Structures are given as C-alpha cells and as structure tokens.
Amino acid sequence: MLDPKFLRSDIETAAERLALRGYKLDVATINALEEQRKVLQTRTQELQAERNARSKAIGEAKRLGQDVAPLMAQVGSLGSELEQCKKQQDEILEQLRQIALLVPNLPADTVPVGKDESENVEVRRWGTPRQFDFEIKDHVAVGEDNGGLDFATATKISGSRFVVLKGQIARMHRALAQFMLDLHTQQHGYTECYVPYLVNADSLLGTGQLPKFAEDLFHTAINGEGDEEGKVRKFSLIPTAEVPLTNIARDEIYDEKALPVKMTAHSPCFRSEAGSYGRDTRGLIRMHQFDKVEMVQLVHPEKSWDALEEMVGHAEKVLQLLGLPYRVVSLCTGDMGFSAAKTYDLEVWLPAQNTYREISSCSNCTDFQARRMQARVRGADSKPQLLHTLNGSGLAVGRTLVAVLENYQQADGRIEVPEVLRPYMSGLTHIG
C-alpha cells in the first residue's frame, strides 16, 4: 500500500507515476474525500477546544457556587457532536484506505516505460542454445515417451491443467527442488522454512493478492473448533510461498542488526489462472498446481536495491549450474506485478518453442507490502520504520523440469540427467 499521506499531499505526482503502469488513479474522489476529512478535522479541533473551555468554566462556576446545569448541557451537546465528527472522520479514512488497497506500487525510476511485455528490456544473456542434429520434441512428447508425464490420468482425477508425474521424471522433479534448496541454504545464506499452504485473508492482504485478485485464488472454509467453535474459518490456498514467508514479518519490529532476513521454501502453488483461457493449454507451463522454490528477503530500506541484484544472481546460479541458457529481462512499467516497484524476469531457453519463457520473477516491493503488514525495523537510536520486502522464484520447479526435458533430450529418446542433479538421483546419468 502506498503511503496515505503521500497520496493526500502529492496526489498529482502519484497519478503521473501510476499512469506509467497503466493505472488511472481516481484523483477527483480522493481529493473530495480529503477535503471532507480536512473540514471534519478542523471542526473536531474546534469542538475539542470549545468543550475544554466549557469544562474550565464549569469548574470556575462550581467554585463560585453558580448553577452549572446550563454549562453541563452545553458540554454534553458538544460531546455528542464531537463523537459524530470523529465517526465521520473514521468512515472517510476507511474509504481512503479501501481505495489505497487497490492502488499498485509506484514504479522505480529505473524501470523502463512501456505498455506490455513487448516493451520489456533485455539486460543480458547467458549460455548458447544447443544445436540439435535430430528433430526436437517438446517436453510433453519427451516426458510421455519416457512414461513420466500422464496428463490423461490427471484430467480424469481433477480436470485440465493438472499432471501426474511418474518414475524417474517424478524423481527428477523432486531432485530439482532439493538441489535448489541446498544451493540457496548452503551457498546463498537463506534459511529453509516449511510454511502453511492454507492462509487467511490478512496474509493475502499483506502481500497484495487481496482485495484485488481474489478470483486468481482457490478458496476453502471449515467449521471452527475450540475458541472458534460455531464460526466458519476461511482460507485460501497459497498462489506462492511468498505469501506465508513474507507474512512472517507481519506486525513485527526487527532490530536493524538482524537484517537481512533471508528465507526460502519449497511449496506447491495453486492458481485459478483466471484470464488465461486458451493460453499454454499443452504441457506443464501453466498449471493450476505447480511447485516452486521461493526466496524472500526482509531488508533495511537503504539496501533493497542491492538486495534485488543479489537475488537475481541467486536465481541465475540455479540455471547456470543446470547448464540451461537464459536471459534476464527488466519488466516495463505496464508488465509489472501489483506489489512490485521493479521486477526482473529470468527466461529460460525452450528449444521446442524456439524462444525464451519465464522461469523466475524477482521483485523489490520496497515498503509497499511492509506498510500493509506493519513490518518494521528499528535502529539503535531511531524510531521504527517500514522495512523493505523482496521476493523471487528460485526457481519454478515444473518449468525447470520442462527446460531440462527439452534441452537434455537425446537422439535415442532418452533424457540426460544434468550433472548437478546426479547426486540426488543415485548417480543416474540418463532416464529412459
């Protein structure tokens, strides 16, 4: 959430910057509410001063033995009006808050300006795409030929956009996640976490999925027990482990010496893919359920931009060790996620599609999520201030499996196991 004081005091600047990402701020409504708030605030201050004066007069009248009933009646009337003014102020502040919850983060000055993904800017490339001397198969054909991808059975069990992984390909999927976790915890300084896959609305509000993106989530509810007996407990399945990991900081104040806090988790992710009808209907690219290794950092505000570059490097290292060609792209203003001030995407080379596809997004959310969560940091001689949050995929496990199946396919139909995965697969060198 943006700073409400900034929205009220410099709304034109906010509107201009938000317009760069295709968001039209309702300036007229905010200004009208702000004018009402100012009028009520002024009236509240006048009433408080008048009531204080009447209260002093009552004390003086009592001292002189005068009748205080008229003054008491006046104070009572002032009190009623004062309470009404405060109530109206609170209602207006809540209206402003609800508007603010729907406003995305401001793009950083270094973000390229553009309308959509076609205007994203390539930053660098790593690796050279392999030249095949046989007809390339896509990951679906490679996986099915090796008995490891079963979409038909998953459709019977659940419907479209699900898969059953089997045998050595299921094992490779597990190996990829273990490899990523080991890399991030042993070399990059992250603490591994196991997190809830069901979260409450406050958590989703904190990271920015709610209230705007409720249709992208899967929701469920159960009857409460214990102190909550008779109530309905509502949950949503996590769209990413970013949600529970980042919310660890909700309502917390960290000593600045404890930062950065770096956390990672392997979890399934659940997305309705609303608005994606007809896109990537074949294969593992766009699923309702997929696994991801997530990275989250909580950092001092002065260090978040360096932390973003570091996090991108951590995601890149996974691809480099797997020997998968990729490129790094800076998302333009019109393609960034709701909570991000700046985002880099890593796109891996998929030979069957003859293109690069997203496999990781790394974002600096500055104080946008922290303000919603009241996640703060305090120095030795300073008041608590909002910390900065960052998140990144390190990586999407299913899409990494796709990249391995396509880039490591062999002419005889087998799949070579990347060298860094072999210790996780009992030394296996090939599948098939």
Swiss-Prot record:
UniProt-annotated binding residues for L-serine: 240-242, 294, 393
Source organism of this protein record: Tolumonas auensis (strain DSM 9187 / NBRC 110442 / TA 4)
Similarity comment: Belongs to the class-II aminoacyl-tRNA synthetase family. Type-1 seryl-tRNA synthetase subfamily.
Gene Ontology biological process: selenocysteine biosynthetic process; seryl-tRNA aminoacylation
Keywords: Aminoacyl-tRNA synthetase, ATP-binding, Cytoplasm, Ligase, Nucleotide-binding, Protein biosynthesis
EC number: 6.1.1.11
Disulfide bonds: none
Record flagged with keyword Chaperone: no
PANTHER family noted in UniProt: SERINE--TRNA LIGASE, SERYL-TRNA SYNTHETASE
Name of the protein in its database record: Serine--tRNA ligase
Recorded domain comment: Consists of two distinct domains, a catalytic core and a N-terminal extension that is involved in tRNA binding.
GO cellular component: cytoplasm
Lineage: Bacteria, Pseudomonadati, Pseudomonadota, Gammaproteobacteria, Aeromonadales
Entry binding sites for ATP: 271-273, 358-361
A single MF term (Gene Ontology): ATP binding
Assembly: Homodimer. The tRNA molecule binds across the dimer.
Main function: Catalyzes the attachment of serine to tRNA(Ser). Is also able to aminoacylate tRNA(Sec) with serine, to form the misacylated tRNA L-seryl-tRNA(Sec), which will be further converted into selenocysteinyl-tRNA(Sec).
Subcellular location: Cytoplasm
Catalytic function, reaction form: tRNA(Ser) + L-serine + ATP = L-seryl-tRNA(Ser) + AMP + diphosphate + H(+); tRNA(Sec) + L-serine + ATP = L-seryl-tRNA(Sec) + AMP + diphosphate + H(+)
Pathway: Aminoacyl-tRNA biosynthesis; selenocysteinyl-tRNA(Sec) biosynthesis; L-seryl-tRNA(Sec) from L-serine and tRNA(Sec): step 1/1
